[in-house]
Amino acid sequence: MSGAQRRKTGCWTCRLRRKKCNEDGQPCSNCEARGVFCHGYGPKPSWKDRGEREREEAQRLQLISRARTRRARATPTNSINGEPRRPSIDMNTSDMGSPIQMGLGSSDSSIFETSSLDLLDIPELGSSLWEPTLDIIQVQPPPSDAPSALQFPSILGDGLEEKEIDLIMYYVVEVFPRQHSSYQGTSVMERSWLLCVLKRSSSFYYTSLSLSAHYRLMSMPEGGQGRTALLQEYERYKTCSLFRFQELVSSATRPQSPISTGVVGESVICGVQIAMLEAVSKNMQSSYLHLSSAALSLAQLLDNTSTLDSSSISTNTTPPSSVLTTDLYHAGSMEYKALRCFSIILIWNDILHCSAQQTIPAAAKTYQKLLADESFIPLFADIVGCEGWVLVPILEAMLLASWKKDQEAKGQLSIRELLTKVDHIESILGDRMKRLAPAVLRQKEAGISSQSPEQIRLVHTYIFAHASFVHLHTVVSGAQPSVPEIRQSIDKSLAAWQLLPPSLINFKTMAWPFCVCGSMAVGSQRELFQKIMSENFQNQSTSSNLHCLKSVVEECWKNFDKRVPEQSPSSYNWKVVMEKLNLSILFI
């Protein structure tokens, strides 16, 4: 076989790069030695399309590999000096495939040679996917001064600067609302905290530029004018965002407190932002690794602040333990608004994704503490379009499933103890449902046309609550649609689905309950779910998300209908089916 031929064995990364793979684990030794992300040996990745997405992934791996080679050859004698500069990228560099020197003077160029650009692929983290820790991110010490911050010049005499301003405005006005369609800060002024973080965090700045460039690319036709140049800009901004985030995370290994950075909770905010960037690029494994890193940063942030003497805390440096609540003392701070927003996005996605993956979130204990705070959970409604308490029974059911599996493995499962735990979770749901049910019934009587945004969020919460009932009893009884509690909860969930106007159904918010209940539907229940899907396929903004969910639900139906008595219910469990189809609901 010639070296130019595509290899048919080995990990997906080596096959893409046409390298010999030793197939000796994940990451394989070849990927580990070159410092690139190992995509493993599982089902064909979503980027493997023999087209543009495959070329983009190859280019991304090439950028990282070349950066590592440059670093190995470098003499680490230079340092960064001078005032912080506006982050910008030299778009005139002749080496289009190598990491660029972004917004740096001649004395700054060594940072791309003395530090690793590999962090965001985190090959070391890939080998311990379900038990990530910040300690395993091994990087060289970053430059001694603070990273560049966005400066607003008085004269726009620079074409590159105008490009960046255009992309930043596109992010604030178009991309952020598209990514977070449930966020209730609908006007640009209500999103002014974004500019604050963009100005103070270079990692957030470059990641936002990358996201903006990505969505611009998605709106351009194949072969459109300027597409190639924009793709190169996207790759360069992304490379810089990875480097800046590497600096940020590596600072956590230093003796000083990891929260004493330029922005409160910066590693949380930027970790979530980069996870979203990887998700829209369909690098789902990398996205989850960064989400896990952000979760650990959040846990570390809260653990550190809880031990500090509140009398010595400065509002500009170290936040108190109430940093994520509605404490009026901090409500007006733009940095705290950003931290609350991205922490909620993190918790929401991490819990639901881990539920789909049948794993326990790395920061589960931190989430439990936050979700027990009645001043914190109301914040979810305005950010994700659903009340935050619905995550409590979901997380508790995940912990129950883990406990049950462990007890069964030991041969020590007590049915009485199992039922006691189930009763506790049901009581959480029951107490909340007593408040929800009358309000939803009034909406049913009033009709769809009279619903306000607050009423829509109430219906979302009601649907989630009944999906949680189904989820809980699936843990106890397996994926069995005939179980009375499962069948009844699906019926009540469907009644609420029909209260939502098709144009207002947000499948980014509702992906989890749709899969939980839709996958277990039988008979007339399926007809109603099919109606929901067909009505929403007319809405092009949700069709790609819905296509993923539709594939999972219909595969579950097919497997259930052709089941045999001795067949395991796992064949029509939506979580198992989603894994086999290589799909994800993370940042869907």
From Swiss-Prot:
Chain's role: Transcription factor that regulates the expression of the gene cluster that mediates the biosynthesis of ustiloxin B, an antimitotic tetrapeptide.
Keywords: DNA-binding, Metal-binding, Nucleus, Transcription, Transcription regulation, Zinc
Pfam families assigned to the protein according to its UniProt record, in alphabetical order: Fungal_trans_2, Zn_clus
Predominant location category: nucleus
UniProt-recorded name of the protein: ustiloxin B cluster transcription factor ustR
GO cellular component, one term: nucleus
Subcellular location: Nucleus
Coiled coil start-end: none
Residue ranges flagged as DNA-binding region: 11-38
Disruption phenotype: Impairs the production of ustiloxin B and its intermediate ustiloxin F.
GO molecular function, a single term: zinc ion binding
CDD domains (alphabetical): GAL4 (cd00067)
GO biological process terms on file: positive regulation of metabolic process
Domain of life: Eukaryota
InterPro entries: Fun_TF, Zn2-C6_fun-type_DNA-bd_sf, Zn2Cys6_DnaBD
Region named Disordered: 68-92
